[in-house]
């Protein structure tokens, strides 16, 4: 499972170097797509297959489910690391996530996240200053 956060830069062509601890995680290819809170999710192909199975199980008759699937799938792009361990992030995804210059590459269960540093700081601060739901804490420390 990938963990940690690494500050990097995204070049003018939309390429970001994958931090060394994360390279093996995505060496067989990856899917980049829109994530929550304005970041990008980066799934290794094996994890993406599990995500697809979960999304396919959502009810087609539910408007919220359809909207979420549309949001998630329409932004998805397949990618591989180049010979300099960079991943190319499409312009539409860079615009969505506000990635221009500095970027935070963060680990999460089953995926990586690419963040605009300002949004990353806001997201981390929000967690620090908002008590988690009691159910979440009970499961976390159990």
UniProtKB/Swiss-Prot annotation:
Q: Where is the signal peptide?
A: none
A GO CC term attached to the entry: cytoplasm
Q: Give a GO molecular function annotation for the protein.
A: transcription cis-regulatory region binding
Alphabetical keyword list: Cytoplasm, DNA-binding, Repeat, Transcription, Transcription regulation
Q: Which SUPFAM superfamilies match?
A: AbrB/MazE/MraZ-like (SSF89447)
Highest taxon listed in the record's lineage: Bacteria
Tell me the Gene Ontology biological-process terms attached to this UniProt entry.
negative regulation of DNA-templated transcription initiation
**Stretches assigned to the SpoVT-AbrB domain:** 5-47, 76-119
Q: Which InterPro entries does the entry link to?
A: MraZ, MraZ_C, MraZ_dom, MraZ_N, MraZ_sf, SpoVT-AbrB_dom, SpoVT-AbrB_sf
Where located? Cytoplasm, Nucleoid
Q: Which Pfam families match?
A: MraZ
PANTHER family assigned to the protein according to its UniProt record, in alphabetical order: TRANSCRIPTIONAL REGULATOR MRAZ
Q: Which NCBIfam families match?
A: division/cell wall cluster transcriptional repressor MraZ
**Family annotation (HAMAP family):** MraZ
Assigned protein family: Belongs to the MraZ family.
Quaternary structure note? Forms oligomers.
Instruction: Please give the name of this protein.
Output: Transcriptional regulator MraZ
Which species does this protein come from? Answer: Deinococcus deserti (strain DSM 17065 / CIP 109153 / LMG 22923 / VCD115)
The gene is mraZ
């Amino acid at each position: 499972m990938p963990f940690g956060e690494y500050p990097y830069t995204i070049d003018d062509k939309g390429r970001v170097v994958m931090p060394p601890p994360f390279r093996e995680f995505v060496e067989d290819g990856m899917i980049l797509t829109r994530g929550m809170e304005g970041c990008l999710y980066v799934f290794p192909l094996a994890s993406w297959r599990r995500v697809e199975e979960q999304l396919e199980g959502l009810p087609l008759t539910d408007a919220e489910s359809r909207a979420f699937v549309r949001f998630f799938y329409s932004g998805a792009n397949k990618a591989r690391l180049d010979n300099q361990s960079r991943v190319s992030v499409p312009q539409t995804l860079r615009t969505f996530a506000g990635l221009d210059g500095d970027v935070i590459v963060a680990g999460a269960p089953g995926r990586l996240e690419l963040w605009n540093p300002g949004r990353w700081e806001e997201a981390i601060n929000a967690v620090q200053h908002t008590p988690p739901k009691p159910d979440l804490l009970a499961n976390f420390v159990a």
